[in-house]
Amino acid sequence: MTVGIIIQTRTGSTRLPAKVMMRADDEFLMIDYIINQLQHSKLSNKMVIATTDLDQDNVIYEHVTNRNIPCFRGDEKNVLQRHYECAKKYSFSTIVRIPSDKPLIDPTIVDNAIEKFQSSSYDYISNFSVNVDNEHEFLPSFPSGTEVEIF
């Protein structure tokens, strides 16, 4: 079983454009914090950045490939297709999806989720849920910023 972490990212955010490329401190960008944290996962085999094929996201591609992190590029609007094509390209049998706006992601939480997924017969697990009763409600079971999905 090949477990791949896919960090989905883009610069086209409407609330805070290019936030992942903002400087977090004197040494690192926001995306670097996520990468650095997830490199400590003991149960994943590979990490890939998945961004769009838009020119504005060339900056993400250049930055992460300079760090020797693979970068997959795909359609901006169809995020699920981007994940599918990325997983297919890298032969992932299990996808760990991490949004790029989670710089404090805990690799222990990620590994615990991978372990739970591997020991179950579930097709999908996450450490948060969305309740649909005429509105969408985020129901975190872990602190904000530590969300992980596996499928």
Predicted regions, residues:
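N-terminal nucleotide-binding beta1-loop-alpha1 segment
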Residues: M1-P17
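Short phosphate-binding loop-to-helix
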Residues: D53-S120
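Conserved core of the sugar-phosphate nucleotidyltransferase
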Residues: I105-F151
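A short, N-terminal amphipathic alpha-helix
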Residues: L29-M47, N66-R67
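Conserved acidic residues
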Residues: V3, N45, S93, D123
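Short beta-strand/turn micro-motifs composed of small residues
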Residues: T9, T51-D53
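Short glycine-enriched, charge-decorated loop/helix-capping segments at active-site entrances
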Residues: V20-D25
